[in-house]
Regions:
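Active-site beta3 strand of CheY-like receiver
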Residues: 45-50
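Short hydrophobic/Thr-rich beta-strand motif most characteristic of the beta2 strand and flanking loop
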Residues: 25-32, 40
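Receiver (REC) domain active-site loop signature in two-component systems and cognate sites
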Residues: 55
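C-terminal output helix
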Residues: 106-116
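Charged docking surfaces used in two-component/phosphorelay signaling
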Residues: 15-23
Length: 124
C-alpha cells in the first residue's frame, strides 16, 4: 500500500482528497499547512505528495523546495493540487520541482489517473 502525503488548508478539499485516496487503497498522511506537512514527513516517509499551493506557515512551493533539497525525499513524486490555474503558476510549480499540476475543482478520476502515472513512472 502506497502512502500519500496530503497537505491542504481547505477542510473541504482536504477531506475530499482523503476520501478519494483512502477508498482507492492508499494510506494517507494529512497536514493542514506546509510546515505541518514538513514536520510530518520527518517521522513518516511518504511515497508521494499532493500539495496545495496556498497554505499558511509554509506554502506548497516552499514545501516542494524543502522536499527537493532533502536527499531522503528528493525523488518523491509531487502533484500540486490548487485553485491557482494561471499558466505562470503552473510553470512556477514545475520549475520548483512538481511532477504534475492539477487545478481545483478537479475530477476524482483524473486525480487518481495522474497519481497512478506518477506511481508507475517514478516508483516502478
Amino acid at each position: 500500500m502506497r502512502t500519500i502525503l496530503v497537505a491542504d488548508d481547505d477542510d473541504i478539499f482536504r477531506e475530499l482528497v482523503i476520501e478519494i485516496l483512502s477508498t482507492s487503497g492508499y494510506k494517507v498522511l494529512v497536514a493542514r499547512d506546509g510546515q505541518e506537512a514538513w514536520e510530518l514527513l520527518q517521522g513518516n516517509p511518504a511515497d508521494m505528495a499532493v500539495l496545495d499551493l496556498n497554505m499558511p506557515r509554509m506554502d506548497g512551493m516552499e514545501l516542494t523546495r524543502h522536499i527537493r533539497s532533502d536527499e531522503r525525499f528528493r525523488e518523491m513524486p509531487i502533484l500540486m493540487l490548487t485553485i491557482r490555474a494561471m499558466v505562470e503558476d503552473q510553470l512556477s510549480g514545475y520549475e520548483r520541482g512538481a511532477d504534475d499540476y492539477l487545478t481545483k475543482p478537479f475530477d476524482q478520476h483524473m486525480l487518481l489517473a495522474r497519481l497512478r502515472v506518477l506511481e508507475r513512472r517514478i516508483l516502478g
